[in-house]
A protein has these predicted regions:
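Cell-envelope/extracellular polymer assembly enzymes that use nucleotide-activated donors
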Residues: 2-4, 31, 178
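A conserved hydrophobic helix/loop-capping motif in glycosyltransferases and polysaccharide synthases
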Residues: 3-12, 19, 26, 35
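Acidic helix N-cap motif at the loop->helix transition within catalytic regions
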Residues: 14-18, 41-50
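Short beta-strand/loop segment that forms part of the nucleotide-sugar
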Residues: 20-24, 29-39, 59-61
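Conserved donor nucleotide-binding strand/loop of the catalytic core
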Residues: 30-33, 44-77
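A conserved acidic beta->alpha catalytic loop
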Residues: 36-45, 90
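Acceptor/aglycone-binding surface of glycosyltransferases and processive sugar-polymer synthases
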Residues: 61-77, 82, 94-173, 198-218, ...
């Protein structure tokens, strides 16, 4: 198994070294691809110093394009046969990576989602943010006849061939619904694994806004009927 961990980053100077250290400590990643989406807080300077060390490969966007664009850049550069998307903000704990990989390693799944709603320990989160996540997941289940608990999770793991002929167009937070819609329409085997979760609030730099929820709704509807 060759695991590529893809980390999209935007203005995470306080957490980037910590998250990279935690991923490295798992000793599972053959490469760690960090895509900086034109950070302005010193993150880029930190990453330049880390580039090439202990499997870290840094890619720099010349201008801010959005999380989805950063993920797509990372996917295009990844060489592993299993790909894992890891947020840089410490909400998702890399110590969960071994459990996320198991269903794929055991031949039970093509795609694994780390679910924040399956009962593992988590910090109390903002009510309306939780409601929005639940509603988007419920909408996904209705449109695509599935029983996911957490469509919007930032932890997604999948075999490389899953995206072999898949065109992802999302540039922003609509990556999650677009990717989910397309794997469901292709009937890939999806497992969900319970993860720990330590959510940030807007004062701590959480970047998801109301507009992103509307964009996600549109993506779910659109990709139900096209591609």
């Amino acid at each position: 198994m060759n695991l590529s961990v893809i980390i999209p980053v935007y203005n995470e100077v306080e957490s980037i070294k910590v998250i990279l250290g935690r991923v490295q400590d798992t000793k599972l990643a053959k490469e760690i691809i960090v895509v900086d989406d034109a950070s302005t807080d010193g993150t880029r300077e930190v990453l330049r110093k880390l580039d090439g060390k202990r499997g870290i490969h840094v890619l720099l966007h010349p201008r801010n394009k959005g999380k989805g664009a950063a993920v797509r850049t990372g996917l295009a550069a990844a060489k592993g046969d299993i790909l894992l998307i890891q947020d840089a903000d410490l909400e998702y704990d890399p110590r969960d990576i071994p459990e996320l990989l198991k269903p794929i390693q055991e031949g039970l799944a093509d795609v694994v989602y780390g679910s924040r709603f399956l009962g593992r320990a988590h910090r109390v989160t903002m009510f309306w943010h939780m409601v929005a996540n639940r509603m988007l997941t419920f909408m996904t289940n209705i449109l695509y006849n599935t029983i996911l608990t957490d469509m919007e999770t930032g932890y997604k793991v999948f075999r490389r061939d899953v995206i072999g002929n898949m065109v992802i167009r999302a540039n922003s937070f609509d990556f999650e619904p677009e990717f989910t819609a397309k794997i469901l329409k292709r009937n890939y085997r999806i497992f969900e694994v319970a993860i720990t979760f330590n959510p940030r609030d807007y004062t701590q730099g959480k970047k998801i806004k109301l507009y992103d929820a509307f964009e996600a709704v549109w993506a779910l509807i659109k990709y139900r009927f096209v591609e």
